[in-house]
Amino acid sequence: MSERWALAPVEGGGALLVPLGPEGLPAGEVRREGDLVGAVRSRPEVGRWVWRSTAEIYPRLLAAGVRVERCYDVEDAELLLLGHEGRLGEPRSAAAAWARLRQAPVPPDPPPRAAEPGSQSSLFEPEPVSVPFEGLLAVYADQQRRHEGTEHPGRMRLLTAAESAGMLVAAEMNRVGLPWRADVHREVLHELLGERYAGGGEPRRLAELADEVSTAFGRRVRPDLPTDVVKAFAQAGIKVRSTRRWELEEIDHPAVRPLIAYKKLYRIWTAHGWGWLQDWVREGRFRPEYLPGGTVSGRWTTNGGGALQIPKVIRRAVVADDGWRLVVADADQMEPRVLAAISRDPGLMEVAGHDGDLYTRLSDRAFSGDRDHAKIALLGAIYGQTSGDGLKNLAALRRRFPLAVAYVDDAARAGEEGRLVRTWLGRTSPRAAGGGDDDEAGIPQEAPGEGPAVEGRGEFAPGYASTDARARGRFTRNFVVQGSAADWALLMLAALRRATADMRAELVFFQHDEVIVHCPADEADEVVRAIRSAGELAGRIAFGETPVRFPFTTAVVERYSDAK
């Protein structure tokens, strides 16, 4: 399966296709066939299909029962190459790339498509600017040349292949869907929120909590409006900057308890309530549209549906089919292990070379057995907590693991100076002058120790678009680690997809460091082994031969909520 063919759909359901040579140029005559699906199905020897967009073609193949082993997504490759060239933000469509080759006016990318609950993604894509087949071939050949001109061509080609594999996984997960029991979901909502009132108003429990908040303030207050809450506290002589839970918990006022409870339930009602259930769950499956590389760091996002923010209590509705199981796997302390691999720090690689708790081993090496201090120090180095206790802990970390700390320090310095940084495989940060929504950066925006409990999951503000040098440095410090972890995750998914190809098992969910496989009960043990093997294989492929291990904590359950 070493052949590589280019493929493009044409009107009437047909296709243009041609074999490609080693340089990316056509190695034969262009053929026109009347059935795109049949053209792919009849060529099982093709090792990689080159096409404009996976979202444009692959759902159609999957609907016909055709699965491809590998692909090359031209538009995704264009995005990665533009980023490497410091041009992130320029149009990344095949039509735009073709226009640049001809020095013609470059068309803008189509606007993002609104989420269509329960739909197959390609059916609702905005109409792209057309590009002739010869244009697609020219863009692909040019991309092969541009790969050769990158800082590490082999790594960059690997990243492109891995991201294209991620596109296949995303389309397959959308097709299969996450098992979802609507009846269980409704039971959970009734248990949490109480009865629904006619007219779409707040359910009973939210209304009760809202009344408690108002009673505590002595006047009518809308707990769903942060400005109203902040104003009410101010009138009570209490200054608050926001209504975030960690800030409210510091306040001694009778409104705090019902307000926190209200906010938690309100979030469930609006994000995963009855309306969400009606829109997004069809025939026992939740089918979000996954967007690989949806953030600049390479982490995935979804187009609507809130798949990556499913509350634990709602996970009770994620139930395996009869006779099947959910294999839920979490990568253990993934980002610290990735830092060990990319920094090549001998001491940290030795710590990360075992399957056990990394922070415990770290504490034994440098923090007199104090696991909490070890964790704060390492996450502080990654996320930029370099003051107060974080500075003291960082000094201890720097003495024992100088290469690891220097790696992220150098990345931070580059960001402060307005320079670009790259992940291990070559994904490149945006320029400091770029714009964008900080929440889309995939980078935490709350430093460890400055807000909620340290988990490396808060959020820094601003972000990569900031004109503040220190904020930019915090972004790039984390980018090189989080982005490299996202690269590893792509390779893990590709390896797992390949390992389960001959099973009935289905990849049904992925976020950051967690994967769920839905499989017959008698395949569960084999799936667990496949996940663990995929993690180790991805580590070797991404980072070479290092002592670093990439273990998973796995649980075989009937219900997602039982895994945590």
Residue spans for each PLM region:
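Conserved "right-hand" nucleotidyltransferase catalytic core of DNA-directed polymerases
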Residues: 1-25, 119-125, 129-310, 323-325, ...
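Conserved RNase H-like, two-metal-ion catalytic cores of nucleic-acid enzymes
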Residues: 1-92
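Polymerase palm active-site segment centered on the conserved acidic dipeptide of motif C
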Residues: 53-54, 58, 189-222, 401, ...
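Helical catalytic core of nucleic-acid polymerases
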Residues: 74-153, 167-168, 172-174, 197, ...
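Hydrophobic, well-ordered secondary-structure elements that form the walls
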Residues: 298, 330, 489, 496, ...
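A structural signal for short secondary-structure junctions
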Residues: 319-321, 489, 500-503, 508-512, ...
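Short amphipathic alpha-helix segments
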Residues: 481-501
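Short beta-strand-to-loop capping motifs
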Residues: 517-521
